[in-house]
Amino acid sequence: MENNGEMNAQPELSVDITKTYMYEKLWNICAGPLCVLPKPGEKVYYFPQGHIELIENSTRDELDHIRPIFDLPSKLRCRVVAIDRKVDKNTDEVYAQISLMPDTTEVMTHNTTMDTRRPIVYFFSKILTASDVSLSGGLIIPKQYAIECFPPLDMSQPISTQNLVAKDLYGQEWSFKHVFRGTPQRHMFTSGGGWSVFATTKRLIVGDIFVLLRGENGELRFGIRRAKHQQGHIPSSVISANCMQHGVIASVVNAFKTKCMFNVVYKPSSSQFVISYDKFVDAMNNNYIVGSRFRMQFEGKDFSEKRYDGTIIGVNDMSPHWKDSEWRSLKVQWDELSPFLRPNQVSPWDIEHLIPSSDISQSSLKKKKHWLQLNEIGATLSNLWTCQEIGQRSMNSPISVPEFSYPNAIEDSKFLSGLLLNHSLLAIPNENYNSDQMIQPRKEDITTEATTSCLLFGVDLTKVSKSKDSICPIESCKKSLPQDKKFDQTQPLRSPKEVQSTEFNFTRSRIKVHMQGVAISRAVDLTAMHGYNQLIQKLEELFDLKDELRTRNQWEIVFTNNEGAEMLVGDDPWPEFCNMAKRIFICSKEEIKKMKLKNKFFQPESKALTSSDVPPNVTDN
């Protein structure tokens, strides 16, 4: 397994699942919580710009003179063939070798985990102190971890002790003497029992992390995670001088043109340049602009996870020679200082989009205030038309509206008239009651004494004003308005449910799209489309289906309306579909059959959309 100081941290295929899982678990712990590797067979985007940055640890100027030599896109769509978890024997630092195949839809991969059962693994990790790495000291182990990870000690002895044998990531065995002694009594690896030799050989220093695992069969394995200031770049034993700069790009270009497999080396502490397809698409859907707020996760010098917020101050190419590259395309400004260095330019998939809490609270407050106003006006007008205490008149009786004392009385009367005629927030007891009977000039005073008060905009409608100027007939207000702004009083009244539905239709532009078997949802803007053709094309791009939705051999597109009914996309004219659709689902044919059997699926008389029903230039139906 050894090759120029390079060790494969994965066992051969003949090794049982327990040992394989222990290797992967130990490697992942040593790599850190921020390291995310793709899975074999997964679709990814490979960014050569990030690969060069990792290998060369170069500046932007050094990257600039490489790109013009080769005709290579800023990103390559690939599929993962295999992943080898490796460790550098000289430093015990872990890294991964990822095998990629450019632009292929099907790749045969070796399934090294035939059993889906996850073995039980106990582990602990400890940041080493000065006492732990001193020649005269030993490794002190917390009691809880010693009980979980080590065989039980014989407590009947004056000094409980046992000898343990553990293997490192590349299979070398090390012996440690585990004792339980001292005042107070503690579990520890003694310096004379092998720990001192181990610490010296591995060149352990303060801040390194010692990780130990115990499998179901009692096997012990350990790894080392170097302190932040001691972590280096890709080991020179892994990448020879011939593979630097031009060699890396040349090998990728050759693989891209010949459609053959190529390998890339990934170090956990570096920026991720092999990105999952779903993660990339989800990041691009955020539409980051200047001024957008974000949060990014880091690992501190003490290996604790930290999150820092910032603001995007620029969106552009990091290098002029890599046009339209998303690699570090966001120039950022951080809110606060940090004890470690942070990048000034980041990639969209490395950050989390934030919506300012102040904007959320203000938006919700405005919406709440708006609905409160409408509800109050609706309740007042409903009382105005239904209460019998005002003069004990029927609904056919004429009514006058007091004049408003502030200057915008005409505009407010316009609002009131529109509210009465268009929003229909009041209850209508008589179907034959028309708007001409609703609003008439006042011809007589109300003589019946009111028993209750009814306020409209702070004015008591039950009190009879003695001033002639206090009454402004609606007709006079309407005459003062321009001809083109007069309201049509013959417009039919609509129910509150219709009004509410209309208002929601105007505010809903982006709706969620869920695909069966895909964890991450997408969002589409129906207002930016002109027909079903564009919708299907957009969905195929988002989920990488390649005409599978148009042919309808495997998938069907379903949507839910405001009432939760599930219907096939294509049964309704495009404008009606845009108004009704609340969520879109891409389901398999089998799932549609199950929905029909459970009577959960609503089928109108017309058939669903097929590829033949949609001509190439359909725009609105």
From Swiss-Prot:
UniProt xrefs under SMART domains: B3
Pfam families recorded: ARF_AD, AUX_IAA, B3
Record's keyword terms, sorted: Auxin signaling pathway, DNA-binding, Nucleus, Transcription, Transcription regulation
Domain PB1 positions: 508-600
InterPro entries referenced in this protein's UniProt entry, alphabetically: ARF_dom (IPR010525), ARF_plant (IPR044835), AUX/IAA_dom (IPR033389), B3_DNA-bd (IPR003340), DNA-bd_pseudobarrel_sf (IPR015300), PB1-like (IPR053793)
Feature: DNA-binding region: 124-228
Biological role stated in the UniProt entry: Auxin response factors (ARFs) are transcriptional factors that bind specifically to the DNA sequence 5'-TGTCTC-3' found in the auxin-responsive promoter elements (AuxREs). Could act as transcriptional activator or repressor. Formation of heterodimers with Aux/IAA proteins may alter their ability to modulate early auxin response genes expression.
GO terms under biological process: auxin-activated signaling pathway; regulation of DNA-templated transcription
Domain description: Interactions between auxin response factors (ARFs) and Aux/IAA proteins occur through their C-terminal dimerization domains III and IV.
Species this chain originates from: Arabidopsis thaliana
Assembly notes: Homodimers and heterodimers.
Localization, UniProt: Nucleus
One Gene Ontology molecular-function label: DNA binding
Recorded family membership: Belongs to the ARF family.
Name of the featured protein: Auxin response factor 13
